[in-house]
Amino acid sequence: METDDQYYRAIKKIKEAAEASNRAYLTSSKLADMLGISQQSASRIIIDLEKNGYITRTVTKRGQILNITEKGLDVLYTEFADLSRILAIKNNVVITGTVTSGMGEGRYYVARKQYIIQFQEKLGIIPYLGTLNIKVDQASLPELRKIRGFRGIHIEGFKTEDRTFGSVKAFPAKIQNIPCFVIMPERTVYTDVIEIISDKYLREEINLHDGDRVSVEVYT
């Protein structure tokens, strides 16, 4: 197993080779040249990256295709978020998407007393018991990945007799100038849907229906 630094450098080089996409034709020899290491070490890194879910690998007649997974991209976006925090760079983002209905899970989770107390203490709101779900446009997925890399406002998880409720992170946001918060699990879940909480029933407040297109400004 290679070091985390070698993982990061390898994923970064693969992304550089891929440019705008997340896939690149890249031999282990070429990656070795890019990293300044032996071909054997580069081959081992590629195998480790694939085994640990950071990339997928396909061999074709044209050569080897390395595709960076969401887990691999998270390595880069987390590094970006850490550098932004260290350098005090603000990275507010705008995400566009479509209003969609969930399975009612948002209401169940938001209604937990242990969460509500923290929402009031840390976010300054007692939320409407439900979430507004937005299916993120393909073009906004890089912005969603960027948000996932940031720490946000920590909401502590807890246990009950029946189950465990995980920690959550929240980000201040606005939708049509109405303050709200984007919430997501601290344990990364790869989904193209974001959940929004507010002290208002946003569907009624903004007259939103499934299929409506919206933009959400998120403050990291």
Curated annotation (Swiss-Prot):
Pathway linked to the protein: Cofactor biosynthesis; FMN biosynthesis; FMN from riboflavin (CTP route): step 1/1
Binding residue positions for FMN: 188, 195
Binding site for CDP: 102-107, 200-203
Single biological process term from Gene Ontology: FMN biosynthetic process
Region span, Riboflavin kinase: 93-220
Keywords: Flavoprotein, FMN, Kinase, Magnesium, Metal-binding, Nucleotide-binding, Transferase
Residues holding Mg(2+): 131, 133
EC numbers, comma separated: 2.7.1.161
Domain of life, per lineage: Archaea
Pfam families noted in UniProt: CTP-dep_RFKase, HTH_Crp_2
Cofactor section: Mg(2+)
Broad enzyme group: transferase
Cofactor note: Binds 1 Mg(2+) ion per subunit.
Chain positions covered by the region annotation H-T-H motif-like: 1-92
Gene3D superfamilies assigned: Riboflavin kinase-like, Winged helix-like DNA-binding domain superfamily/Winged helix DNA-binding domain
GO molecular function: DNA binding; metal ion binding; nucleotide binding; riboflavin kinase activity
Catalytic activity, reaction form: riboflavin + CTP = CDP + FMN + H(+)
Keyword Flavoprotein: yes
Its biological purpose: Catalyzes the CTP-dependent phosphorylation of riboflavin (vitamin B2) to form flavin mononucleotide (FMN).
Family (UniProt): Belongs to the archaeal riboflavin kinase family.
UniProt cross-references to NCBIfam families, sorted A to Z: PRK14165.1 (NF010762)
Protein name as catalogued: Riboflavin kinase
